[in-house]
Amino acid sequence: MKCMSIKAEEISALIKKQIENYQSEIEVSDVGTVIQVGDGIARAHGLDNVMSGELVEFANGVMGLALNLEENNVGIVILGPYTGIKEGDEVRRTGRIMEVPVGEALIGRVVNPLGQPVDGLGPIETTETRPIESPAPGVMDRKSVHEPLQTGIKAIDALVPIGRGQRELIIGDRQTGKTSVAVDTIINQKGKNMICIYVAIGQKESTVRNVVETLRKYGALDYTIVVTASASQPAPLLFLAPYAGVTMGEYFMYKGQHVLVVYDDLSKQAAAYRELSLLLRRPPGREAYPGDVFYLHSRLLERAAKLSDAKGAGSLTALPFVETQAGDISAYIPTNVISITDGQIFLQSDLFFSGVRPAINAGLSVSRVGGAAQIKAMKKVSGTLRLDLAAYRELEAFAQFGSDLDKATQAKLARGARTVEVLKQGLHEPLPVEKQVAIIYALTRGFLDDIPVEDIRRFEKEFHAWLDKDENGQKLMEHIRTTGDLPNEEDFNKAIEAFKKTFVVSE
């Protein structure tokens, strides 16, 4: 029987080959241990090299955001359900900062602040992401606001106009029509090459559903993204929602497009941030808000801009909402946001309940930029309208005490009452700017002075219908639409006189 001989050289060659082919894959990760969890906040030991604002991952796959870097532990806000996280769990660094998906695929969808769809219409196919915290455009990258953003609401376009790239605060008590103003503005952007983003912060889910259905009904969802962090969601998501919305908008702005972002509302974001800060044991300041609550809103609203031509001439317009308590606009968050924005529209509950809708207080509302963006025709017809209306409100209060008023005062009161009627507008009935100009022209040139106040709304409706049918009326409207300026005033006056002859005053 032959004995098999084993050569030492062969064995050593084989071992050598195995050693050469051996690959050791060592994965180094920075891992910490959860030492405390509750109320959407976790504290972790370890994670020595974690950065402020970095994403971390818990053992059950839930993500968190490192906000507090302390001597012995890290304060983490949990971006999701925290019930599955317990003391002793592992938490690891990801090396990434918070990002959201961006792109055309988001248009027409309802997403949460992490960019995940919540409308049941399947996954969203996006290829790009952007960090939610990014620097605002610099001084030299901006341009003065000069293009109008037509809201379709007479009281806003005439009294407190908004330009593309502006930040206009909408402030008022609850139930004064703030959301309606935003929804009507979004509906009016149809066909104007505008992307709209509606950010619902701490709203009831039924309210968000109603807004989405309204936008769908008027065909506005075709150019709108809805970002929602409802009242039932954890505070971190409410805090992040506005940043997610503006990040999605910036993608389009830097591509040279025009974007409108509505934040409904920032009071709830500030309250969510206060909750997080107190749970993280940061020192409280005025009204228990943390010291950096101003920076919370300023870094968000500074990202709204009109970009220079060199940067693509895109724009991002912000309409932040702030809810007041009993009309107190001198509270902490309202004064903060007023100082950051380029003007405010103050909606007053007294006006709302007396039937003046939209309930805009002309005296306290102002636009610090938009006048430069008004079309020439609107600027000519609405020049002193805001001041006249504010003066009328003062006279109205004074007139209740005086019985014998001089003729000039009576004329002012009569014109003021008609102005209030003209500026009233139904829900979801935005008007094209040329029709707004037509009725305000008729008002300011005295054509409505002999029409009874109760007939003004009907006069306006029939006048607009007449302008659509009449050949001369169509030409006048086309002139305003194409040139942005008033047509020949004599022709305009003749057209209004011609319509007035056909209008029947009610008995």
UniProtKB/Swiss-Prot annotation:
Q: Which SUPFAM superfamilies does this chain map to?
A: C-terminal domain of alpha and beta subunits of F1 ATP synthase, N-terminal domain of alpha and beta subunits of F1 ATP synthase, P-loop containing nucleoside triphosphate hydrolases
The UniProt annotation places ATP binding at: G172, D173, R174, Q175, T176, G177, K178, T179
Q: What class of enzyme is it?
A: translocase
Compartments annotated for it: namely: Cell membrane
Chain positions covered by the region annotation Disordered: 118-141
Give the membrane topology, semicolon-separated if more than one.
Peripheral membrane protein
Keyword Translocase set for record: yes
Task: State the EC number(s).
Answer: 7.1.2.2
Q: Does the keyword Plastid apply?
A: no
Matches recorded under PROSITE patterns: ATPASE_ALPHA_BETA (PS00152)
- Keywords for the protein's UniProt record, in alphabetical order: ATP synthesis, ATP-binding, Cell membrane, CF(1), Hydrogen ion transport, Ion transport, Membrane, Nucleotide-binding, Translocase, Transport
Q: Which Pfam families does the record match to this protein?
A: ATP-synt_ab, ATP-synt_ab_C, ATP-synt_ab_N
Molecular function (GO) terms for this protein are: ADP binding; ATP binding; proton-transporting ATP synthase activity, rotational mechanism
Q: Partners and quaternary state?
A: F-type ATPases have 2 components, CF(1) - the catalytic core - and CF(0) - the membrane proton channel. CF(1) has five subunits: alpha(3), beta(3), gamma(1), delta(1), epsilon(1). CF(0) has three main subunits: a(1), b(2) and c(9-12). The alpha and beta chains form an alternating ring which encloses part of the gamma chain. CF(1) is attached to CF(0) by a central stalk formed by the gamma and epsilon chains, while a peripheral stalk is formed by the delta and b chains.
Q: Could you tell me which HAMAP family the record lists for this protein?
A: ATP_synth_alpha_bact
- Note the PANTHER family from the entry: ATP SYNTHASE SUBUNIT ALPHA, MITOCHONDRIAL
Family in the record: Belongs to the ATPase alpha/beta chains family.
Query: Function of this protein?
Result: Produces ATP from ADP in the presence of a proton gradient across the membrane. The alpha chain is a regulatory subunit.
Q: What is this protein called?
A: ATP synthase subunit alpha
Record the organism.
Anoxybacillus flavithermus (strain DSM 21510 / WK1)
